[in-house]
Amino acid sequence: MILEGSGVMNLNPANNLLHQQPAWTDSYPTCNVSSGFFGSQWHEIHPQYWTKYQVWEWLQHLLDTNQLDASCIPFQEFDISGEHLCSMSLQEFTRAAGSAGQLLYSNLQHLKWNGQCSSDLFQSAHNVIVKTEQTDPSIMNTWKEENYLYDPSYGSTVDLLDSKTFCRAQISMTTSSHLPVAESPDMKKEQDHPVKSHTKKHNPRGTHLWEFIRDILLSPDKNPGLIKWEDRSEGIFRFLKSEAVAQLWGKKKNNSSMTYEKLSRAMRYYYKREILERVDGRRLVYKFGKNARGWRENEN
């Protein structure tokens, strides 16, 4: 892959990518490019140096911030490194992710050339809006007539039987604010003095479903009788009050119609990412996978 400003490829390990940082690393002034190989968060380093896990974290971030259904982005199509990801064209993103491909491609291009270490700065500069077509009753009626599941608490369609149709209907990009023509003084000031990211081993108020489950297990005094450890050393746990957990998650996500059936369906999304595992033959029993963090007793 040819990088801007690089005329000769140097194969000497002593002068490799850790010493020859391309021009786009200027957008990450407080970041150590090499730290991508040692567990740093995805927004702290340039996408070129993401691990496969950091690619997945980026995809999860887009799902969460844009309130997309998990089926909109097929994670199995992105079991790749950051270098591979950065080499993909818009057409390749579209083939891999369908209607979500444009969102992923546009988001990645912004990160590559205008990225900041702080995810908050990134979100303010790159405004991706996902909206529903609820203003057109005929569209909503068509979805209902075709037996798609409609969740009024979200004001949008969720858990559609045809996820591809759902994603095509849901994803709407705002292009006017993606790449500003001229930088304002405030934006320039933010780029010159980026907000430092303070990372922790785990966030006690995790925004992901698996983190929410983990945090209940880690705080049994605050959430008694909901979930219990079956084998803490192996990361195995059981739902005691599955519907109560679902209602708590629904409250967190402003979805009053959340049920355990929907919750368990969302949990399956973490299987391929090896964050959660289903324990065969045991109802309501799950296990944290090798990519889940913050649940072990010896983790700080």
Swiss-Prot record:
Q: Where is this region: Disordered?
A: 181-203
Single Gene Ontology BP term? positive regulation of transcription by RNA polymerase II
User: Which key words tag this protein in UniProt?
Assistant: DNA-binding, Nucleus, Transcription, Transcription regulation
Q: What is any one of the record's Gene Ontology cellular component terms?
A: Golgi apparatus
Which residues carry the record's DNA-binding region feature? 207-289
Keyword Metal-binding among record annotations: no
GO molecular function terms listed in the Swiss-Prot or TrEMBL record: DNA binding; DNA-binding transcription activator activity, RNA polymerase II-specific; RNA polymerase II cis-regulatory region sequence-specific DNA binding
Segments of skewed composition (Basic and acidic residues): 185-195
Keyword DNA-binding carried by entry: yes
Q: Domain PNT: where? A: 29-115
Which CDD domains has this protein been placed in?
SAM_PNT-ESE-3-like
Where would you find this protein in the cell?
A: Nucleus
| InterPro entries the UniProt entry points to | EHF_SAM_Pointed_dom, Ets_dom, ETS_fam, Pointed_dom, SAM/pointed_sf, WH-like_DNA-bd_sf, WH_DNA-bd_sf
Query: Domains: what does the record tell us?
Result: The PNT domain acts as a transcriptional activator.
Similarity field: Belongs to the ETS family.
- Annotated function: Transcriptional activator that may play a role in regulating epithelial cell differentiation and proliferation. May act as a repressor for a specific subset of ETS/AP-1-responsive genes, and as a modulator of the nuclear response to mitogen-activated protein kinase signaling cascades. Binds to DNA sequences containing the consensus nucleotide core sequence GGAA. Involved in regulation of TNFRSF10B/DR5 expression through Ets-binding sequences on the TNFRSF10B/DR5 promoter.
Name of the protein in its database record:
ETS homologous factor
Organism, as annotated: Mus musculus (Mouse)
* Protein's gene: Ehf
